[in-house]
C-alpha cells in the first residue's frame, strides 16, 4: 500500500491483452436464454428516403420493409355489356331480380344505361372475389342470350357451367322451309322435344331463330349438342329419344 503522501498516479486504460475474451460457449448459452438477441439490431427499421438504392445489411443481403396487408381489389374495373334491342324490354321487366345477385352476392356496383343500351358493372372496395366481374358479365350475357334469370343465376353459384352457341348452318346448309322444319324438329310439338333433351342431359337450351345456345356442364353440353345435331340432320325424334335414355342411364350409373 503506497504511503498517504505519495503522488497519485493517473488511471491508465487497460491494455488490449488485459481485456477478458469471451469464453467459448458463452454466446451459445446467451442465445439459448434470449432467442433473437443476435438479430435485435438487424430488425430495427431505419427510415429510408425515397431513392433507387437498394438497402443491404452487413452480410450483403437485401433488406426489405415488412409486408403490408393490401386490399385484394387494387383498382376499380368496369365492364359494359351491350344489350340487344329485343332484350331491352325483358331486361326492364326482370331488373328487380337481376341486380340483387350482382350487388349482394358478388358485391358489385351495377346500373342499366338505357341511353346506350348497356348494363354497366364496376368493382368496389367491398368486392372480395377477383373473378366477380367476369362472373357478373357471364350472368348478364346469359340473360341477353335468352336464358331465364333462375337459370342464369346458376353461373354465379357453380364454377363448372358454360354456354356454347352454334348455328344451324354450322351443321348443315339450309334455307327457307328446310331450316324452319329443322327448328321445328328441335323444338317438337309444344316444345316437348326440347324439354326432353334438357331433362335427359341436365342442360338448358335456347332456340333463337337459327342460333342455338346450350347452358350446362361440359359433358352435358356435349350430350345435348349431339342430340340437336342429329335432329338437324334429319334423324327421327324417336331414335334421338332412345339414345338419350341410354346415355342418361349411363350417366346415372356413374354418379
From Swiss-Prot:
A GO BP annotation: ribosome biogenesis
InterPro entries in UniProt: KH-I_PNO1_first, KH_dom, KH_dom_type_1_sf, KH_PNO1_2nd
Gene3D superfamilies: K Homology domain, type 1
Positions of the KH domain: 179-228
Domain of life from the UniProt record: Eukaryota
Subcellular localization(s) per the UniProt record: Cytoplasm; Nucleus, Nucleolus
CDD domains attached to this UniProt entry: KH-I_PNO1_rpt1 (cd22391), KH-I_PNO1_rpt2 (cd22392)
Primary localisation category: cytoplasm
A Pfam family annotated for this UniProt entry: KH_PNO1_2nd
Entry-linked SUPFAM superfamilies: Eukaryotic type KH-domain (KH-domain type I)
Gene Ontology CC: cytoplasm; nucleolus
Molecular function GO terms recorded: RNA binding
Keywords from the named record: Cytoplasm, Nucleus, Ribosome biogenesis, RNA-binding
Family: Belongs to the PNO1 family.
Self-association state and partner proteins as the record states: Component of the small ribosomal subunit, ribosomal RNA processing complex (SSU RRP complex).
Function according to Swiss-Prot or TrEMBL: Required for small ribosomal subunit (SSU) synthesis. Has a role in the processing of early nucleolar and late cytoplasmic pre-RNA species.
Protein name: Pre-rRNA-processing protein PNO1
Gene source species: Gibberella zeae (strain ATCC MYA-4620 / CBS 123657 / FGSC 9075 / NRRL 31084 / PH-1)
This protein's encoding gene: PNO1
